[in-house]
Swiss-Prot record:
<keyword id="KW-0464">Manganese</keyword>
<feature type="transmembrane region" description="Helical">
    <location>
        <begin position="130"/>
        <end position="150"/>
    </location>
</feature>
<feature type="transmembrane region" description="Helical">
    <location>
        <begin position="69"/>
        <end position="89"/>
    </location>
</feature>
<dbReference type="InterPro" id="IPR003810">
    <property type="entry name" value="Mntp/YtaF"/>
</dbReference>
<keyword id="KW-0406">Ion transport</keyword>
<dbReference type="GO" id="GO:0005384">
    <property type="term" value="F:manganese ion transmembrane transporter activity"/>
</dbReference>
<comment type="similarity">
    <text>Belongs to the MntP (TC 9.B.29) family.</text>
</comment>
<keyword id="KW-0813">Transport</keyword>
<feature type="transmembrane region" description="Helical">
    <location>
        <begin position="3"/>
        <end position="23"/>
    </location>
</feature>
<feature type="transmembrane region" description="Helical">
    <location>
        <begin position="107"/>
        <end position="127"/>
    </location>
</feature>
<keyword id="KW-1133">Transmembrane helix</keyword>
<dbReference type="Pfam" id="PF02659">
    <property type="entry name" value="Mntp"/>
</dbReference>
<dbReference type="InterPro" id="IPR022929">
    <property type="entry name" value="Put_MntP"/>
</dbReference>
<keyword id="KW-1003">Cell membrane</keyword>
<keyword id="KW-0472">Membrane</keyword>
<feature type="transmembrane region" description="Helical">
    <location>
        <begin position="41"/>
        <end position="61"/>
    </location>
</feature>
<protein>
    <recommendedName>
        <fullName>Putative manganese efflux pump MntP</fullName>
    </recommendedName>
</protein>
Length: 193
């Protein structure tokens, strides 16, 4: 696979991470450097690690993984999206102004769950690369680095949108609903409904 093809693949794999980063930046309103670093590093790491794991798993579990990957991503994104939406509704109900979300998408368990959920596709790519007999390390590194950069851009875009719209609790609600929509779209893409 050429470097250009790997780069395009990395961009495609980073789109879920970009969407989550925009939502996170919007919900946080004024993300700090630590938010950029944590989200970019986590998403970049998982986008690097998942193809490597998929490559090592190889063909032996491919059919099993393809049968369940969309359900895993759906549950993880749905869980975080639901928490964000409920937090946004609470902020709106309590008429909190300029409140940061009570659910920090860049910390703790939320960060790990989002990292895994946005990189499930990369696991399948690793399986595919194993079938093609492609060496994994350089490709996985490119995928991880591209995802980290795209994630940082997404957080910045989300911050800009939040500042322009002064969204407050609406941003967190919209972010949660967006994650729920992404989760449902994953099931739609796998023809569940």
């Amino acid at each position: 696979m050429t470097i250009f093809a790997v780069f395009l693949l990395a961009i495609a794999l980073s789109m879920d991470a970009f969407a989550v980063a925009v939502v996170s930046g919007c919900a946080l309103q004024k993300p700090k450097v630590c938010h950029y670093v944590r989200l970019s590093a986590a998403f970049g790491f998982f986008q690097f690690a998942m193809p490597v794991i998929g490559w090592w798993l190889g063909v032996s579990v491919r059919e099993y993984m393809e049968a369940w990957d969309h359900w895993i991503a759906f549950v993880l994104l749905g869980w975080i999206g639901g928490k964000m939406a409920l937090s946004g509704l609470r902020a709106l109900r309590n008429r909190e102004s300029c409140a940061c979300p009570s659910v920090d998408p860049t910390a703790g368990r939320n960060l790990v769950v989002l990292g895994v959920a946005t990189s499930i596709d990369a696991l399948a790519v690793g399986l595919s690369l194993a079938i093609l007999g492609t060496p994994i390390w350089a490709d996985a590194a490119i995928i991880g680095i591209v995802c980290a950069v795209i994630t940082a851009c997404g957080v910045y875009l989300g911050k800009t949108l939040a500042n322009l719209c002064a969204l407050n609790g609406w941003a967190e609600l919209a972010g949660g609903l967006t994650l729920l929509a992404i989760a449902c779209n994953i099931l739609r893409e796998h023809q569940v409904f």
